[in-house]
Amino acid sequence: MPSWLRVSLICLAVILAVSFTAQMLMNAYLVRQQKAHEAEQKAIDDHYPLMYADSIRRISAEYNLSPSLIASVIMNESSFRPTVQSSVGARGLMQLMPDTAEWIAHKLRMDDYRFEMLDDPDTNIRFGCWYLNYLSTLFRGDPLCVVCAYHAGQGEIASWLANPLYSTDGITLNRDSLPDGPTKIYAGRVIRDYGIYQAKYFDQADFTSSPDPVDSD
């Protein structure tokens, strides 16, 4: 065999070996990337579960609310535990207080209402959606105002809107300027999780549009 042919064959073998090694390394990299993606997705699934999805979709649609918002509120209020009761008496998936729930029951004309009925997921979601719809109407559909009011009460948020430290226009709030405390933390988590639930589970327009008003007379 001529020396030039031997050298050519050796070079070809080296090129093929390098190409094969590169392909193997690329395949191994892609496998690692896929496993990392699957692990990340599992972590999201574990941290952001979705239960009662049919009820959330159906009832939120009745009140023209984003199901992602409802799922996020439920996640932060009760972690989807339907019978949980807080130390201050809030109950169920959306952690409704007794006085608020009784007022909502009156608005919904539920003459047979009892507080323990809020352990029922559909009932609790309906009450929570009614209340969020009411707050959305009151605060012109501003997401931050609505979420803060759900946590701290509408009177507190009205006072924040009247304070130039927290609102420059009396209509919207600046989250970075809100007073430090549980409501600021809560609102940040709900709005963050809203985006995650929206991206992962739901395909719907953003919640910033104003809902149809409920009868609050």
Where are these regions (language model features)?
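Catalytic glycan-binding domains that act on GlcNAc-containing polysaccharides
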Residues: 27-217
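Hydrophobic membrane-insertion alpha-helices, especially the h-region
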Residues: 8-25
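N-terminal Lys/Arg-rich, disordered targeting/topogenic segments
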Residues: 1-4
